[in-house]
């Protein structure tokens, strides 16, 4: 079976640097080079029986010149990427991996627009994840955070986001509107694991959509799902529809 095309386009991958230590404390410091650029690594793998840690991985992965567009076909929307990732994860004896990831995307090209300083962070366990993303761009600021916990019928999902002064025309995402400017707040809060037992709400707050020369404002739009089995209810509340 052939490898996926993006993997083939990586070409020959070389590692230059140093791998040293013992199996319970192995250090990989160096550079991975491929046809699309290089990634610097400063990682420690190991275990600590005294602290009941079966395995751990921590360290840093970074790149200053990754040519993502070369992985895909012609006219793909990607360009270059620069990033810095820190990871700290461990697995206790008889347990599962958990840890934390912090990432700063210093530059990321998409549709010929260069995004800068995208910050992401996340904590993960076997059945849960929580994280945040912050994009502070002159043509739109986004802050979002969310948590997901898988617990069968009691699974939990909570997501909040705030988008301010989003200019999709300047980001080369659309040319259908003249000088569009979008702001909104979103909250989703649910429990359940399928459409039959899902309970919670989605709330869209203070949606502002301005163009030249018109504008639209929606103070609130909320959808609430409640009840079980045959007693399901769906309630919609908004400025324009109830």
Task: List each model region and its residues.
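Interface amphipathic segments
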Residues: 1-242
């Amino acid at each position: 079976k052939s490898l996926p095309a993006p993997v083939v386009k990586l070409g020959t991958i070389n590692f230059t640097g140093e791998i040293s230590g013992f199996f319970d404390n192995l250090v990989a410091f160096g550079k991975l080079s491929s046809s699309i650029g290089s990634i610097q690594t400063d990682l420690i793998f190991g275990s600590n029986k005294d602290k009941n840690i079966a395995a751990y991985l921590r360290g840093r992965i970074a790149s200053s010149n990754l040519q993502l567009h070369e992985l895909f076909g012609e006219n793909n929307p990607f360009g270059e990427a620069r990033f810095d990732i820190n990871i700290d994860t461990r697995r206790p004896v008889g347990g599962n991996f958990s840890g934390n990831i912090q990432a700063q995307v210093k530059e990321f090209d998409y549709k010929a627009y260069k995004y800068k300083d995208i910050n992401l962070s996340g904590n993960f366990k076997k059945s849960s994840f929580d994280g945040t993303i912050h994009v502070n761009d002159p043509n739109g600021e986004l802050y979002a955070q969310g948590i997901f916990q898988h617990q069968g019928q009691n699974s939990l999902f909570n997501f909040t986001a705030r988008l301010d002064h989003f200019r999709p025309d300047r980001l080369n995402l659309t040319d259908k509107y003249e000088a569009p400017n979008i702001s909104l707040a979103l909250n989703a809060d649910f429990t359940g694991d399928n459409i039959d037992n899902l309970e919670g709400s989605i709330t869209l707050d203070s949606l502002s959509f301005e163009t030249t020369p018109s504008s639209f404002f929606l103070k609130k739009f909320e959808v609430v799902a409640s009840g079980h089995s045959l007693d399901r209810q769906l309630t919609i509340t908004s400025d324009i529809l109830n």
